[in-house]
Amino acid sequence: MNKKTLVISIDALISDDIPFMETLPNLGPIVKGAAQVRDIECIYPTLTYPCHVSIMTGCYPDKHQIVHNEHLQVNVPKPQWNWWYRDIQVKTMLDYAQAADLSTATVTWPVMAGAPADYNIAEIWAPTIQDDPTEICTQANSPAVKEIFERNKHRLKWMLTPEFDNYAEHCGAQIIEMF
């Protein structure tokens, strides 16, 4: 049997939340049996995208160059998000895993659009809630998950939660089942 490593990040989770998580019917058994990193010292700036890239690289933002969730675009009312893997300036766990001939998957992990994961459902959305996400998601996701995306894109409601989380949950489960 192949060994597998699963990295789960729950945005804004703090160590004080873990006892409650252990009581949950689905997440509880996973949390109880998992290796955990508790009481970490956050990077600065403590924003979702820089934090998640630091987890993937082991580097601070001054090295990996993802310093904010969005690009700095002066006088732009809605700046572009830092979605694209190509903007990370150092190697990530994906690069090291591929060099070791391991298969990889990511499901809505920040800054993974266009990532070299074998199975990648990127955290990305269309410009507005009215826009069809198919084109941008097709560019951002790995080709191997095209069918999974098509089956689940009706769950994707722009960047809204809980719909976005529901989309990620279904895509992740199907990646595990299929591959």
Placement of each model-derived feature along the sequence:
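Glycine-/proline-rich flexible loop or hinge segments
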Residues: 10-12, 37-38, 48-51, 70-82
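Short N-terminal binding/cap micro-motifs at the start of the first secondary-structure element
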Residues: 14-19, 115
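Loop/turn elements at helix/coil->beta-strand transitions in domains of secreted/extracellular proteins
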Residues: 1-5, 34, 100-104
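N-terminal secretory/membrane-targeting segments
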Residues: 1-3, 20, 162-168
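His/Asp/Glu-rich, glycine-adjacent segments
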Residues: 59-179
